[in-house]
Regions:
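Conserved catalytic-core segment of nucleotide-activated headgroup transferases in glycan assembly
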Residues: 210-217, 355-432, 507, 539-542, ...
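Catalytic binding pocket for nucleotide-activated donors in carbohydrate/polymer assembly enzymes
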Residues: 346, 432-437, 466-541
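Active-site and donor-binding regions of nucleotide-sugar-utilizing enzymes
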Residues: 35-38, 65, 198-360
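Short acidic-hydrophobic, aromatic-tinged amphipathic segments that line or gate anion-handling sites
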Residues: 252-259, 441-446, 502-516
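Donor nucleotide-activated moiety binding/catalytic core segment of transferases
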Residues: 254-264, 424-469
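Basic, ligand-binding patches in group-transfer machinery
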Residues: 1-198
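C-terminal alpha-helical cap of glycosyltransferases
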Residues: 543-559
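A donor-sugar binding/catalytic signature common to diverse glycosyltransferases
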Residues: 278, 283, 301, 447-492
Length: 559
């Protein structure tokens, strides 16, 4: 949290009790918000700010503040020098009032944190106390912002954060009432539900059914007796492109944000998912009673991709913001990364293999050669305007590649197509990649089965995407196009040295990339031997029994 604030920022755990700024009350009126907080001792405050977490588009706005020593009637505005007696005692708690108007700020989507800067050079986060966090669950603290919504929430370490996003259908009062009614019903009937041993399975945002979660769910539906599978549920949005083919599972398929969805999230014995707990409910919701309960549930993390190319321990680690109970991996190589960097005991990091790999087979055809280009998303570009995205290096580099005349001519000459697959978090920017190159086809993730694209492709071009492991698993060549490697390392980092340990050729510029593409086409997309040898270390199983192992693991843990 508070990325980019440097070493001066004091975390909740690093601050002594006297240095923690604790929020005791929040007030919202129109576009104005007021924070009432308390410090354990006198602080020489230099300024108060509202600061964006976006590292590529940094911004901060000054906030007004005043100090009031407890037991005193005077208020102090701006910078205040405390008396020698007050400073010497160091024990006199001080009240702080911080306020601002979002109507005078240009805020964009994402997280905005409140900080106090002291004259000693500290940057102190503002922490929500337990009572205030509880009030956020039941009160309406929404700050109106047109078709957007801005609201206070507790982020990592209970930091006060204002979150800005597009307004969604689940922001309604009706949804809030339904959540509270379902919660009350569950609490009154809790013993009944606890006996059912409910498993809840889902994938990214509950909008997809084509990752490890759905393949494990299908295995359970097709291989377990009725008594065992009756309380195994898959959550999916009715708007999902996979909804029609999943309807055959009847009541085991649960509509997203329905009353049953809310109830099963509360009653579940365990979640089994390819993404974190917050993907199992409304995304970035206003504080509510159900998400508070979700965060405390057991979870088997099936993962979306092999953990190696992107550091995620601050998110998924034992002490991270989204910790897991069990963390499924694919090999001893990956297990070592997780146990050494995430803080989990080895017995909670089982080597099971990915359930979606049970159905993988090489379907590449010599008469339908295609190169799948699948870049991952950039956190610093998420929720940005179309103008900001189009001006980014990310957009510019891929547009130049798709429109490269030398590459286009070579593809045409060899009858090779490019399928450019954009990440779902950037699907609104698909138009930015439109090209007149007739060898290029643009698609958004979810519009076609991803595993089919992987099985049918001749080669993959990516940057840091974990889908590269699926292609590596199938013994196909992978090219890594890492033009923004330094920025990626700054923002994310990795667990392997990507300058030497990747399982495919690496390029930093378009000239290198086009050269390698042409070489692979000329060699009929044959994987290089040195990369083929790495497969033994990277995959413990290729026996198509990963779902069975996953089921056996859950049963062994009494789930």
């Amino acid at each position: 949290s508070g990325a980019g604030n440097g070493s001066r920022m004091q975390s909740n755990s690093e601050c002594s009790g006297n240095r923690i700024i604790t929020v005791t009350r929040l007030k919202v009126k129109g576009s104005d918000f007021t924070v009432y907080a308390q410090a354990g001792k006198a602080l020489k405050i230099e300024k108060a700010v509202l600061k964006s977490r976006n590292i590529v588009r940094p911004a901060e706005y000054p906030l007004e503040y005043e100090l009031l020593p407890k037991g005193k009637e005077r208020h102090f505005s701006g910078r205040h020098q405390f008396s020698e007696e007050q400073q010497a005692s160091g024990r006199q708690p001080f009240q702080i009032r911080i306020w601002g108007s979002t109507g005078n700020m240009t805020l964009w989507e994402g997280d905005w944190d409140v900080y106090l800067y002291t004259e000693e050079g500290e940057i102190l986060p503002v922490i929500l106390d337990g009572v205030t966090r509880l009030k956020l669950l039941f009160g309406n603290y929404e700050i109106p912002k047109g078709n957007h919504i801005l609201f206070p929430m507790a982020s990592t370490n209970h930091m006060l954060t204002l979150h800005d996003r597009l307004r969604a259908s689940y922001d309604s009062t009706a949804t809030a009432v339904k959540e509270n009614v379902i919660y009350l019903f569950y609490m009154l009937t809790k013993p009944v539900w606890n006996r059912k041993k409910i498993w809840v399975i889902y994938e990214k945002y509950c909008t997809e059914a084509q990752d490890n979660g759905s393949y494990f769910f299908k295995y359970c539906m097709e291989n377990l007796p009725e008594k065992e599978k009756k309380h195994i549920y898959f959550i999916l949005d009715k708007k999902s492109l996979q909804w029609p083919q999943m309807k055959k599972y009847g009541r085991n398929l649960v509509p997203f944000m329905s009353a049953r969805h809310m109830l099963y999230m509360l009653a579940a014995r365990i979640y089994v998912a390819s993404d974190a707990r917050n993907h199992g409910f409304a995304w970035k919701p206003k504080p509510n009673i159900i998400t508070r309960q979700i965060s405390q549930k057991k979870m088997l993390f099936l993962q979306h991709g092999v953990t190696a190319l992107k550091r995620v321990d601050k998110l998924f680690g034992k002490n991270g913001s989204a910790p897991m109970t069990y963390f499924a991996v694919t090999s001893e190589f990956e297990q070592k990364i997780v146990t050494e960097n995430f803080g989990y005991a080895k017995e909670n990091v089982p080597i099971l293999g990915f359930t979606r790999w049970d159905v993988l087979e090489n379907k590449a055809r010599p008469d339908e050669k295609n190169i799948l280009i699948m870049p991952t998303w950039r956190p610093w570009l998420e929720e940005q305007s179309d103008e900001v995205f189009r001006e980014s290096e990310y957009c510019r580099r891929y547009r130049q590649l798709l429109e490269n005349p030398e590459l286009g001519a070579f593809l045409r000459e060899n009858n090779v197509k490019i399928i450019f697959h954009i990440h779902p978090k950037m699907k609104e920017f698909l138009e930015a990649f439109q090209t007149e190159n007739d060898q290029v086809k643009l698609i958004v993730q979810g519009s076609q089965p991803l595993n089919e694209l992987i099985m049918k492709c001749s080669m993959l071009i990516t940057d840091y995407s974990s889908v590269s492991w699926d292609v590596h698993y199938l013994a196909k060549p992978v090219l890594f196009y890492q033009f923004d490697y330094d920025l990626y390392q700054q923002a994310n980092g990795s667990y392997i040295d990507m300058t030497r340990d990747l399982f495919g050729d690496r390029c930093l510029d378009q000239e290198c990339l086009v050269k390698n593409i042409k070489e692979y086409i000329e060699n009929n997309f044959k994987e290089k031997e040195r990369y083929a040898q790495m497969r033994k270390e990277h995959f413990a199983y290729t026996d198509h029994n990963n779902s069975r192992r996953t089921l056996e693991f859950l049963k062994s843990r009494g789930c």
